[in-house]
Swiss-Prot record:
This is Large ribosomal subunit protein eL36. PANTHER family: 60S RIBOSOMAL PROTEIN L36. InterPro entries: Ribosomal_eL36, Ribosomal_eL36_sf. Component of the large ribosomal subunit. It comes from the Eukaryota.
């Protein structure tokens, strides 16, 4: 693409101005994880553990049945994207457990 020059005609005509950068609107932060929410969720996970379907999905992930685990979780949580997120979360938990076991030995 050609270099843009300030000219009187064409797409770049007119005065040279600096772009007014506005800060993101408050409504854009919906769904973002806060420190407090993360703390509460971690506390609940520590107290309650995993749901039965999550434990079964973790067993499937342990034996490298990733696709089967995804289908199983999708059936339980409803949507493909939520299932992928849940599978990722559970595989991260398994990796952390493996890491902790290796560190302990």
């Amino acid at each position: 693409m050609a270099i843009r020059y300030p000219m009187a005609v064409g797409l770049n005509k007119g005065h040279k101005v600096t772009k007014n950068v506005s800060k993101p609107r408050h409504c854009r932060r919906r769904g973002r994880l806060t420190k407090h929410t993360k703390f509460v969720r971690d506390m609940i996970r520590e107290v309650c553990g995993f749901a039965p379907y999550e434990r079964r999905a973790m067993e499937l992930l342990k034996v490298s049945k990733d696709k089967r685990a995804l289908k199983f979780i999708k059936k339980r949580v409803g949507t493909h994207i939520r299932a992928k997120r849940k599978r990722e979360e559970l595989s991260n938990v398994l990796a952390a457990m493996r890491k902790a076991a290796a560190k302990k030995d």
